Amino acid sequence: MNGKANPCSSSSRKQQPSNHDVSSGGKDLQVATLPAYQISDSTWEERAICYFFDQFTIVECNAVGGMGHLGFLPSLYADCRDQNLGNPASLSLRLAVDATALMALSNRVNVPGVVTQARYRFGLALRRLQEALDLPAEAAKDETFATLVILSLFEDISGDRHGLTSAHTVGFEALTRLRGESQLGHAAGLDMFKYAYVRMQIEFLLLKGKPSLDSDRLVERLDSADPLQSLMIIASKVRQLISEPTSASDSLQSAGITKLASWIDSCRRLDSELFQWTQTLSDIWLPLETRTHTGEDVLTYREMIAAVIWAHYRVLRIFIHSVMADLFRALVSLLDSPGIQHEASQHEADGLRISLEMVSDSCRSVPFCFGEIDMLGNPMPPSEQGMSRVRAFYLYTMLWPLWYILSCGLATPEQTQMIRGVMARTGSEAGIKLATMLATYDGRDAMSSMPQLYSLERPVREVSVI
């Protein structure tokens, strides 16, 4: 460790790196080995698949409770390919993986025709997906939901979003409804549900979309002892709470004093629940306070997935305090009460302090999360291949939390410049065009309308096993 740790803050727990961390840290950072896409005796399709699976799928890590990301996908893809299955669900998955892998690799290498092949297979995948969606038995398969997951990655890798809205949110809602509780009973189904749920919450909370799926019953079945799943449970409560104020016919004041007071109390309980979430975490999940070789105070983590989860936690806390501030302002405008005005002023001060701390902690985490330093604060050497030291999936999952830090209006000019810089670098080094788009986002048209890439007709809309 390069310096002494700062005292722990009152809003979350942090630690200093231990001797054990010195010997075992940095497992998520990539070593400078020869990338699979540079092996000369393989086709571009083979190189693309190797690159995509290496960068966007994570094998479960026992140290953090078996968490991975799409770790089942390589074997599922291999089954669909090797068995030469001709059903729409299997064909759509094969084509979606091929298309997304080629698009991901095309952003790393300059080879004529790779992008053309990627978009051609993307079109074929959409066609096969539509065929699967038209057949209830095919629509409910893991392969169909996995296709939707992969196509949503294609959308962000290629930069095909119109505004900030995803074209696949309606599809995620419909298939989540169709698959029901049974999807939580096996590892692949739970993995895909978590991915889809986080995307839907981003759409509804951060981008102020209108959900058509009531997923509360599914979320209630998640494991509250699991850090990510317990945070998802709290996020569901946040969505339930804000759905009422945001649906108010005219303004918050129209809800009346009693309702406003009730919403404020609910916000307080949820903020307390979020804080308590940090107190239940085991040491392996806690941020580590250390100092870089230049004397900068930073936060690092024992596992990269922990950094991602903390990034989403901080956004939820900022979001809750922003909502609470709006509710207090509406209440003060209806009540000429010195007591209420004092309480509102006190909350505004406390909420601003906590929110600024969340922004600061998010920015202090950036050097580690984007591969500039290791867990002990030491600088990482540059990659020989010009790639990020962090897997593309981890960089991808950090984009929306950092975008919210940019858009909430609390970041300093220096913090804003730093976030835009790492996003722009992610766009070029990891080849994720969404990062480039978010880095230059000017705050307009957050929810522009999107054309439907596929239709979700009666078989998917009306059949449900929930």
Q: What positions do the PLM features span?
A:
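Fungal-biased detection of long, low-complexity, Ser/Thr-
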Residues: 1-25, 108, 112, 119, ...
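Central/C-terminal regulatory/activation regions of fungal transcription factors
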Residues: 53-70, 115, 158-336, 345-372
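A broad, low-specificity signal marking well-ordered, structured residues that form hydrophobic/aromatic
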Residues: 95, 145, 193-194, 400
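Membrane helical hairpin/interfacial module
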Residues: 82-166
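Generic structural signal of hydrophobic/aromatic residues within well-ordered alpha-helices
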Residues: 48-60, 69-80, 196, 218, ...
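Inter-repeat boundary and helix-capping residues of tandem alpha-helical solenoids
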Residues: 86, 91, 141, 227, ...
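Acidic, Ser/Thr/Pro-rich intrinsically disordered transcriptional activation regions
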Residues: 14-114
